[in-house]
Amino acid sequence: MSVSAHPDDSEFYAGGTLAAFAARGAEVTLVVCTDGGRGGRGLEDMAGVRHKEQQRAASAIGIARVHTLGYLDGDLAPSDELRDSLIELIRQHRPEIILGHHPATFYVRYGNRVQLGHSDHRAAGTALLNAIYPRAGSPNFSPGQGGDPWYPREVWLFDCEEPDHRVSIGEGFESKLAALAEHESQQGVAGGLTKAARRVAALYGKDDEPAEGFVRLVLR
């Protein structure tokens, strides 16, 4: 399972890794917290457009299950409501590994460039960790979210300043780029995303092999 703030976040930060999981037969679920409605210009129904783009992008990396929670883009908060929605999905899908935003990223250095962190990313990451522990895995918490308690084996945090776990994505890199290209409303943004994805994959990689970086938390 990958939990992201916006459409295209999971593909940008972890698309190659997710493509590899799917290719190995894993049941991968994407959760997108916001509607992405402020992520572009010139389209009235930007949220609806981005929802369709996200479905196509997920298909490009072999993923059929996408949950869009529909929070307002730019105003995401680590609320009890968001936390409880994530608990419900974790218990429903019972993922062994959950990917999501690092909750404390205010900026990331990529070589000589600095990318400021998005407040929605931190909110999504905080809500995810609050959902995982102590609630999702305990019968004593959140009975209203239904399902049997579930505690993932690992959490991999992307969008991080200092990754300690790098995943080679040579086989999934083209699928990642194809997925990013499906976000057509972001052209100008998406073209930049593709270029940035190549640059970041090269920075994390070794011997010309592209990679993605995470902070890896082994929970059990």
Annotated model-derived regions:
Residues 1-96, 215:
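Active-site rim/loop-helix segments in enzyme catalytic domains that contact anionic ligands
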Residues 1, 65, 80-220:
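Metal-dependent de-N-acetylase/amidase catalytic core
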